[in-house]
Amino acid sequence: LGYHMVGDVHLGDWGLQMGLIIEELRDRKPELVYFDESYTGEYPTEPPFTISELEDIYPTASKKAKEDECFKERAQTATFKLQNGYAPFTAIWKHIMNVSLADLKRNYGNLDVHFDLWKGESDAEPYIPWLIQDLQDKGLAYESQGALVVDIAEPTDSKELPPCIVRKSDGAALYATSDSGTILEREKDFAPVKYI
C-alpha cells in the first residue's frame, strides 16, 4: 500500500521472433528492397505488410522453424544482424513495431487496459554491453562451449540448475540478457523499491 506504480507492457520485440518474421517476409516477398544487398537508398516509410499479414507471418514462420533447420538458422542469423544494427532489418523491425503497437494499443484500449510505458526488450539493448562487461569484470560470467554464461544455482536449490546463457556462441543476446538489461534500465530510471 502507498506505492507509486509504473506499468510497462514490456514487448517481446528483440528476439528470435523478429528474425522469424524477417525471414518469412523474405520468402513471401523476396523482391522487397530490404533483401537486396546492393540497395543503398532510403527504405520505404510504408510497411510492407498489414497487421493481418503480420498475424499470419509469425505463426507460419514459427512452425516452419520447427520443421526446417535451415530456415531456423536463417532466422537466427537475421536476429543477430538485427541486434547488431543491420540497417535493412532495422527498417523492417521499425515497421513491425509501428504496425504491432498501433494494433496492441487499440486492443488494450478496448479492454480499458493502460500502461505508463510501452517499452520492449529492444529498449534494454544499450545496457547489454555494459551488463556483459560488468559480469565479466566481476568474474561472474565465463565462456562455456563458445557461449557466455553465469552460474545461477544456489546451495539451497532442490535441483541442479544449469548456468544462464547471457550471450550465445553466435554473439546474439537472449531473453535473460535483455531482461537483465531491463532491470538495469529500471534501476537507473526509477530506482524501484519493488518489482512485480
PLM region descriptions:
Residues L1-I196:
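NTP-dependent nucleotidyl-transfer catalytic core
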